A protein has these predicted regions:
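Domain-level recognition of nuclease-like catalytic cores that cleave nucleotide substrates
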Residues: 397-424
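Interdomain motor-coupling "hinge/lid" segment immediately C-terminal to the ATP-binding subdomain
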Residues: 115, 122-228
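Hydrophobic anchor at the beta1->P-loop junction of P-loop NTPases
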Residues: 4
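Short glycine-rich substrate-engagement loop in P-loop NTPases that contacts/grips substrate
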Residues: 35-66
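Hydrophobic positions on the alpha1 helix immediately C-terminal to the Walker A/P-loop
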Residues: 15, 19
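Conserved Walker B catalytic segment
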Residues: 76-111
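Structural recognition of the conserved hydrophobic beta-strand(s) that form the central parallel beta-sheet
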Residues: 71, 109-115
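Accessory nucleic acid-recognition modules appended to NTPase machines
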Residues: 178, 182-358
C-alpha cells in the first residue's frame, strides 16, 4: 500500500487521479483495472462505512488473474462504526481495519490519500507503521515551476530571472500558476491559511479558543525563518510584543501541530566535529515560501532568507536529511594585561546534507563578491577537516568553479535546475 501524504492543496489527488492514472492507461492497464473512489463525493457516502468500503472494493477486484489499482481519496471520511460482533459499545471498526484487510489481496495495488481536515497525514502513517510506503508530495520545485512558467507565460521569451522573482514571492503551490494577477495569488495563499490549514488544526486538535495564539505564533516563525529560535524565546516574545502569556510547553505543542500538517519543518543543529545534536535552539523552514510570505502580508520578503528556505526544500526533495551545522573552534587572544585568553567560538554552516554515504556542507549567500563577505561565508567550511563536499550557493549568475580550498561555488539557478550540480 502507498500512502500519499503532504501539505493540503499541493497536488496529491492530481498525482493519482490524473498523472498516475494516465501513466497506467498509456502502459496497457485497462480502465476496469483502475478503481477510483473519492470518499468526499456525495455519490460515495455509503462507502464511508468501513464494512461497505471493504465489500465494494472486493467486488471490483474479483478476478484473481488481473492486477488492479485502487485509489481511495480522502480516506479520513470513512467513519468509525460499532463492531456488531462485540457487546462492548466502545469497540469500533475503522478504515484502518478495512485497509489492512484489503492489503492482504495479492492482486491489488492500493493507494490512499488523506487530507488534514479530520486526520493529519502523519497520524495515518503511524497507524500502519511499516505496512505502508509513504509517497510524500511537495509543492512545486523551482525546476518544475520554471517548466510550467515558460509554458504558460504570455511573454515570448520568459526569463529565469522573472520566474525566480515570481517563485520567491508566491512560491510553488500548483494553483498559483493558473492565477494571472498578484492580487489573486495573494488572496489565494492567504485563504489557504485562513480557510484550510488553520481551520484543520483548530478542528482536529480542538483548540478553537487558541486560534489567535496560533496565528501570532505563525507570524513570529514566518518573520524568523533561517534564524535560531526555541519555545522559550517565543514565550518571551509573546509577552513583550503582544502582552500575552503563553507557556513554552504550549508553544512547543503548537509548533508540532504545524509540523504534523507539513506546514513547517523543524531543523536541528548538528555539531560537525563532536558528531552530536543540540536539542535547542533550532531553525524552522516553510514547506512553501509563498505561504510564508502570505502570513506576513508580503511585507517582509528578505531574499537571503527566502533563498535559504528554497535551498532547504530542494535538498529535502532530493532525499537528503538536512541539519544546520555547527563548527566549534578555539581562538586565543591577548588582553590588555598581556594575559592570553582562550575563546570558544561556534561557527555556523547553513546546511549539512546527508544521503547514504554522501555528505555536503552548504552555505547560502546572495553574493560573495565582497572580500569580507566571502571570508565570513567560507570561514566555517575551511575549519571542517573531513573530505566531504563544501559548497557555496549564491544568487549571482556565476560559472561553477572551485577555489584553492576545494570549495565549490554555484549559482542558485544552477543548483535548482540541475540535480547533479552538487557533484560538479
Amino acid at each position: 500500500m502507498k500512502i500519499v501524504t503532504g501539505l493540503r492543496r499541493c497536488g496529491k489527488s492530481f498525482l493519482l487521479f490524473h498523472l498516475y492514472k494516465n501513466y497506467l492507461l498509456e502502459n496497457g492497464v485497462s480502465e476496469e483495472q483502475i478503481v477510483e473512489l473519492p470518499l468526499d463525493e456525495i455519490d460515495n457516502i455509503r462507502y464511508r462505512n468501513p464494512f461497505e468500503l471493504n465489500t465494494y472494493i472486493k467486488s471490483r477486484v474479483s478476478d484473481p488473474t488481473k492486477r488492479y489499482y485502487v485509489f481511495i481519496d480522502e480516506i479520513q471520511f470513512c467513519a468509525e462504526v460499532p463492531n456488531p460482533y462485540l457487546d462492548d459499545s466502545s469497540a469500533k471498526v475503522t478504515f484502518i481495519d478495512a485497509v489492512l484487510g484489503l492489503m492482504k489481496l495479492n492482486n491489488l495495488d492500493l493507494y490512499i490519500t488523506v487530507s488534514n481536515s479530520q486526520m493529519l497525514s502523519r497520524e495515518v502513517l503511524t497507524q500502519f507503521r511499516d505496512r505502508g510506503d509513504e509517497i510524500h508530495v511537495l509543492p512545486l520545485s523551482f525546476a518544475e515551476f520554471w517548466d510550467a512558467f515558460r509554458t504558460l507565460s504570455a511573454t515570448a521569451s520568459p526569463s529565469v530571472t522573472d520566474a525566480w522573482r515570481e517563485y520567491c514571492t508566491f512560491g510553488g503551490m500548483p494553483y498559483i500558476l493558473s492565477l494571472d494577477s498578484p492580487e489573486g495569488k495573494s488572496r489565494y495563499l492567504k485563504n489557504l491559511f485562513k480557510e484550510t490549514y488553520l481551520k484543520d488544526i483548530v478542528e482536529r486538535k480542538d483548540v478553537r479558543n487558541e486560534r489567535e495564539v496560533l496565528e501570532i505564533l505563525l507570524d513570529f516563525v514566518s518573520s524568523a525563518i533561517g534564524s535560531l529560535t526555541n519555545p522559550a524565546k517565543l514565550e518571551k516574545r509573546f509577552l513583550s510584543e503582544k502582552k500575552i502569556k503563553v507557556s513554552h510547553n504550549t508553544i512547543a505543542k503548537y509548533l508540532d501541530y504545524f509540523s504534523e500538517a507539513y506546514i513547517l519543518d523543524a531543523v536541528k543543529r548538528y555539531d560537525v566535529k563532536g558528531a552530536k545534536y543540540f536539542s535547542t535552539p533550532l531553525k524552522y523552514y516553510f514547506a512553501d515560501v509563498g505561504l510564508r510570505n502570505a502570513r506576513l502580508n508580503f511585507r517582509q520578503i528578505e531574499e537571503n532568507h527566502i533563498m535559504e528556505n528554497i535551498i532547504y526544500n530542494d535538498l529535502v526533495r532530493r532525499g537528503f536529511n538536512v541539519d544546520v551545522g555547527v563548527v566549534s573552534i578555539s581562538t586565543r587572544e591577548w588582553d590588555v594585561r598581556g594575559i592570553q585568553k582562550k575563546n570558544n567560538v561556534r561557527l555556523e554552516v547553513d546546511f549539512v546534507a546527508n544521503k547514504g554515504s554522501r555528505r555536503y556542507y552548504i552555505q547560502a549567500a546572495l553574493s560573495v563578491a565582497d572580500p569580507e563577505t566571502h571570508a565570513r561565508e567560507i570561514r566555517s567550511l575551511r575549519r571542517i577537516e573531513d573530505s566531504f563536499g563544501k559548497i557555496v550557493i549564491v544568487k549571482d549568475d556565476i560559472v561553477p568553479r572551485q577555489d584553492k580550498d576545494g570549495i565549490l561555488y554555484l549559482s542558485i539557478t544552477d543548483f535548482l535546475l540541475n540535480e547533479q550540480a552538487l557533484t560538479i
